């Protein structure tokens, strides 16, 4: 959530930054007007309360001296009624302010490219060279069926579209991947966490999914619980409402969890395969950092995700998302896109973001600065390290062989009992 004081004192800068994120200046102007009216009413309320205190003292003095206080009582009752009217107005204005400010996206960092959509994203670097196949490549969903490791038909029967069963060496490959990913992140100083897979509405607000993106989630009917869309939500909210010791920062968390997405706006997109599912595993990275260190931590986090792809030998590129393509809470985001041969293109497999103090303000996560003893908002970062199902897809396609088999990347073999290849039955 944005700082209302910043909007008040640096309106033009904030308006210009949010314009690049699709927010009209009229929205901010209305917010500023509401804020000004609210502050005026607060002053009036305080002045009336001071009058009421004086009137109350005068009534008490009159009663002690056994004098009549009819007029003073009438005056105080009028003042009290005026205070109640103003307080009711303040409640209404506070709600209007909340309705606007809670759905405003984060302001982009100055280094973020300005643009409208993914066409304006900027490629930063590439790693690896896509393999030159001398046979016709198969899509991962066909490979999965032919190898008897992915079962889409029974997934649809048991649950519905965009669900599947992993089986045999497919299940082992999925498990090998997330164990490998977790082990690599632990080497880099991340604490492994097993999170709840349901969170409450306050947690969803804290990380920015609520109220704006409710339709993208699965809520449990008649409860305060939501299935997590990403482990970012429980990991970030771990410290919600707390004040951390500045000497402990930065703090690194990692977790593997299922992620549940309704994909409300994705009808007709990626209807086959592992790219877009309602339920998938993802290894998440979350950091809590001091503001002056957070962008250095973003580069490290991105490198941590790249490390996984490099050790798996998967070609990828790093993209800096433009202002129009970034997620709601992000101030800056790098996407890692892995090469998918059957589609002859790169597809997102990780997204690493610095939200600055946007989530920390919503979730009230602060730290005590050891330098001056002041309590301040920290910065939160999050990143995929990696989306496991998409990594399975990338391995199946990039490591496929002409005979229909798939070679298992060397780093995963210890996690798969020494298996070196997945062969057709």
Swiss-Prot record:
Keyword annotations: Aminoacyl-tRNA synthetase, ATP-binding, Cytoplasm, Ligase, Nucleotide-binding, Protein biosynthesis
Any one GO cellular component localisation term in the record: cytoplasm
UniProt xrefs under PROSITE patterns: AA_TRNA_LIGASE_II
The EC number(s) this enzyme carries: 6.1.1.11
Binding site for L-serine: 230-232, 284, 384
GO BP terms: selenocysteine biosynthetic process; seryl-tRNA aminoacylation
Pathway linked to the protein: Aminoacyl-tRNA biosynthesis; selenocysteinyl-tRNA(Sec) biosynthesis; L-seryl-tRNA(Sec) from L-serine and tRNA(Sec): step 1/1
Name of the molecule in the record: Serine--tRNA ligase
